[in-house]
Every structure is written in structure tokens, then in C-alpha cells.
Amino acid sequence: MMNKVKSSGIKKKDKKLWGLELAMILLAAIWFIPIYYLIVTTFKSPQEATASPLGIPKTWIFENYSNAWKQMSFPRAFGNTVFITATAVILIIVFGSMAGYALARTKTKLGNRMFLLFLAGLIVPFQMNIVSLYKIVKSLHLMNSAFAVILVNVAINTPQAIFLFKEFIEATIPMELEEAADIDGCGVLKKFFRVILPLLKPVISTVVIIVTLNVWNEFLTPLLFLQSRENGVILQEVSRNIGQFSTDWTALFPMLMLGVAPLMVFYIFMQKYIIGGVTTGAVKG
């Protein structure tokens, strides 16, 4: 009798596992099919892309990539994108870590209200304030400047960085380390840069990855503030090749791959730090 109960329980578990595996396969297919379609289309002629959208190319046309490279001025657009992204990431790391440390160690009503104010930046979409941002950038004479996009992206992404740094510091860094630094005569800045900052490497890695993905994929702010093609980013070059009535997908998709490939490589090599950084500060104690 007991054996029958055990066997029926095992069968139920097997059915659940099969159901979960089937769901995972379906989710993987939903994710993979568009990527597959994007990749194979980059090597097709326009006629073949229309006749056989998901088929393997009969003739692999590698010239599509060289044409896209020239048409979108990829080195210039790539350089602009890297400059904007790297500068924004550095500024967010500096400001976010210092603000997160200050809020983590300031146990006052004012500190709590400031933290709630920063959290509001996570809740309210920046698109709601885009008109105000446009007027501010124009009044500062930063139109058509990469620094306009950098400053706006810093303002958009800093609240999330502050939240991650604050929670990580509270969860993992004991006050005894800072008290020992105080005894050794360290000031606030020296204590932060010598003691606290080296311990923030896991969460810094997480913030770097998240902010890089956000800034690299940001399209609205470059579209508004970078009007000349010389200062444009990769996504702007891609959008310029989308026609109002028709689009050559075999020319557009290689541009998309050129723009996405560096980000995919970066994410593949850095994704383990996301889990490590988030889980380290997830549980206090």
C-alpha cells in the first residue's frame, strides 16, 4: 500500500516537472525565434527575406554587413554611444555610491525623506517630465551636445543606483569597520574611499551592468537632444533607415546586429555579477 502511495506521488511530481519543462521550452522558443529571424535575415537578399522569412539563406550575403557598416557610419556612432554610456556609468557610480553611503548611515527623519524622494524617481517615468527636461537642456545651451544626454541619463538612473548601494551597505558592511577607521583618524572622505568603496565591488558590478544596458538602449533622449548626425548614437542611425512606407529589412537588420552585438558580448561576460551583487545585499544579517 505504501509503495503504491509513493509511486503515485512520484508520478505526480514527474507530471509537474514535465509541465515545467514544457513551459520552459515554449518560453525559450518565444525568445529564440525572433533572434533567429533577425540573424538569418541579415544574410539574405530582399527577395529571399520576403519569400522565406524563417528559412536558412540559400546564398549567404555577407556584403549586407559591410554595406550597413558604411551606411550608418558605424565607427562614429559606436564611439559616440560608448562615450555617452561610459561617462554616465562613471558619474552614476560616484554619485550613487556616495549618496547611498550617506543615506545608509544617516538615521534621521530628513535622511528618510530624502531616500523616499529618490525612490520616487524609480516610480515616476522620466517621460512625464520630458518637456521640462527639454527646456532645462535648452536653457543651459547643451542642445546637440553629448553632455545633455549624459546628464539626463545620470538623473534617470541615479535613484536606482542609490537604492542598491544603500541596501547593500546596510546589509553587508558592519559599523565596526568604520569605527576602527575613525580611531585611526580617517576623515569621512578618506574612510569612504579607503574602507567602504573597496567593499562595494559586487554591487558596483551590478550597477555597471544595469546602467550600461539602460543607457545603451536609451533612444528618446538622443533623439531629442542630439540633432546633428555627427553626434548621433547607434539607435539613431538605425532609426534613420526605417522608411515611412517601406523598409529594406535586409539592410536594417545588419545595423541592428552591429548595434546589439557589443552589448550582448558585454552582458554574457558580466551577467554572473548581477546575481552575485543583488543576492549579496538581498538578506540582512
Language-model features, listed with the residues they occupy:
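Charged, structured surface patches that assemble and position nucleic-acid processing machinery
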Residues: 1
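A structural signal for multi-pass alpha-helical bundles of membrane permease subunits
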Residues: 4, 9-12, 16-285
